[in-house]
Amino acid sequence: MDLPGPIHDFLLVFLGSGIILGGLGVVLLTNPIFSAFSLGLVLFCISLFHIPSNSHFVAAAQLLIYVGAINVLIIFAVMFTNGSEYYNDFHVWTVGDGVTSLVCTSIFVSLITTILDTSWYGIIWTTRSNQIIEQDLISNGQQIGIHLSTDFFLPFELVSIILLVALIGAIAMARQ
């Protein structure tokens, strides 16, 4: 990215100060949740350091992996290990819990039935005549996006569903 000198310097100072303040927050804050959020600020600023050097994909990947996954995992681990001092009584199932589990089970069964009944071999995912790909004109980030939305669409979506289920399970465990 060709930024003018003062804007580039301001961006570096802004991101550097975000890293320093976030690092101080990680070390000095006594609440572990606030420390985890400060770590998220540090990881966010570190990922933005790649943008001035035209590494947009690396910045986006670090943002998704470190801030979106690792920091959320750390927050859930902190929430899970601290326990809740407000909610220590035995949880009795209510009607809402039963309805929710019934709805989730029916959605799960319908998804599994749809997956098993679909003839995956008859689906034409892409045709090369529709894809005019000039390798010299498309950047690496665009090639990764094309492959994720064509060749690897089904595995990408399955992984996202598995991660969503894991996230919901972590939330349920952290609440208890």
From Swiss-Prot:
Catalytic activity: a plastoquinone + NADH + (n+1) H(+)(in) = a plastoquinol + NAD(+) + n H(+)(out); a plastoquinone + NADPH + (n+1) H(+)(in) = a plastoquinol + NADP(+) + n H(+)(out)
Subcellular location as annotated: Plastid, Chloroplast thylakoid membrane
Annotated membrane topology: Multi-pass membrane protein
GO cellular component: chloroplast thylakoid membrane
MF term (GO), any: NADH dehydrogenase (ubiquinone) activity
EC code(s) of this entry: 7.1.1.-
Chief place where the protein resides: plastid
Ranges annotated as spanning the membrane: 10-30, 32-52, 60-80, 107-127, 152-172
Keywords: Chloroplast, Membrane, NAD, NADP, Plastid, Plastoquinone, Quinone, Thylakoid, Translocase, Transmembrane, Transmembrane helix, Transport
InterPro entries: NAD(P)H-Q_Oxidoreduct_6, NADH_UbQ/plastoQ_OxRdtase_su6, Nuo/plastoQ_OxRdtase_6_NuoJ
Keyword Ubl conjugation: no
Any Pfam family matching the protein: Oxidored_q3
Subunit: NDH is composed of at least 16 different subunits, 5 of which are encoded in the nucleus.
Function: NDH shuttles electrons from NAD(P)H:plastoquinone, via FMN and iron-sulfur (Fe-S) centers, to quinones in the photosynthetic chain and possibly in a chloroplast respiratory chain. The immediate electron acceptor for the enzyme in this species is believed to be plastoquinone. Couples the redox reaction to proton translocation, and thus conserves the redox energy in a proton gradient.
Assigned protein family: Belongs to the complex I subunit 6 family.
Name of the protein in its database record: NAD(P)H-quinone oxidoreductase subunit 6, chloroplastic
Provenance organism: Buxus microphylla
Gene from which the chain derives: ndhG
